[in-house]
């Protein structure tokens, strides 16, 4: 295949070499539109047809238009001898987005990416290629700027993100249009592109023309901001500037360091931790900023931020980021551990067994969570004083052992350590703990 314009081929080759990518099989996200058509044909040539076109039908538009687009995609791939997979969305995105309280764009994107990941595995491919171009990059930076994004957002769309590649990020929309026109290549036009239904369309159709009138050549300036932002982000990514204590299901920060460190770096660290734990959380700057209003000398412990996936709490001289892996674990538990019988704590996969008792007076051992701590003290003040010894332990993971309503031991389920015991009694009892707070 020979093109009348090889400028895009040159840029794709430069992209591959710059990012040290191999030329193994690629899944190309193909919609039939101008951008993905240009990407598909150029990668077919560059990778010697070691590609699979993947089309995802959202069925957000009318069935008639969607089916016409599918017909075009199939005919196009037949014409150019390109392997094609077509996947139809198995949920109603419009109604489901309302039920979940997310935008149609967001849910459609999630469904499409999930389908692409499955196609990657099915076809034993190395990369998923998306057709974002230079203009998409500009639009993204502007949207993120007005949405109050951090430097990470102003870095723009990454050219390579794990197994996702975007070879056209240095190619302008004008170059794409010229390529298709010169080579007389047909493409499908999505009717929603000209409508202001979605945020990106409104930015593209209404905002950018106004900016262009006032700031000629603004694209170069935004590109420079993006490059500088990326340099900062890469620099902070390399080094850990913030001391963090890591547990199985939590991260802990020193309170004073947390409050005195630049907010940007603290916010970045929190989002980085959430991302590493597979939590995609939308937390507003306003909500996070509230966490910095906590008083250092205030003795009261309190929750600073709470979501469905995690919560941020102040506890003594620490700020703890704790994940809600299983709601069952955070509900109080209170049970009897009988001699010779196993008992399982569901979340942590902890198995407990009272193996033997050297006294007839001990036959059943009571196990309960930290919430029951006041049951063992008549005086609430004495209880607080006693448990203040264990401020280094996260109370969520403390299991209390009691006999005849008397506290005889405390186990930290996070470390499986006996942190305190009434030795005169506990030495008569043998307890086995198997497992640990293992990630699912």
UniProtKB/Swiss-Prot annotation:
Family listed: Belongs to the tRNA(Ile)-lysidine synthase family.
Protein name from the UniProt record: tRNA(Ile)-lysidine synthase
Swiss-Prot/TrEMBL domain comment: The N-terminal region contains the highly conserved SGGXDS motif, predicted to be a P-loop motif involved in ATP binding.
Catalysis: reaction(s): cytidine(34) in tRNA(Ile2) + L-lysine + ATP = lysidine(34) in tRNA(Ile2) + AMP + diphosphate + H(+)
Subcellular location: Cytoplasm
Function: Ligates lysine onto the cytidine present at position 34 of the AUA codon-specific tRNA(Ile) that contains the anticodon CAU, in an ATP-dependent manner. Cytidine is converted to lysidine, thus changing the amino acid specificity of the tRNA from methionine to isoleucine.
Gene: tilS
Keywords: ATP-binding, Cytoplasm, Ligase, Nucleotide-binding, tRNA processing
Chain positions recorded as ATP binding sites: 31-36
Phylogenetic lineage: Bacteria, Pseudomonadati, Spirochaetota, Spirochaetia, Spirochaetales
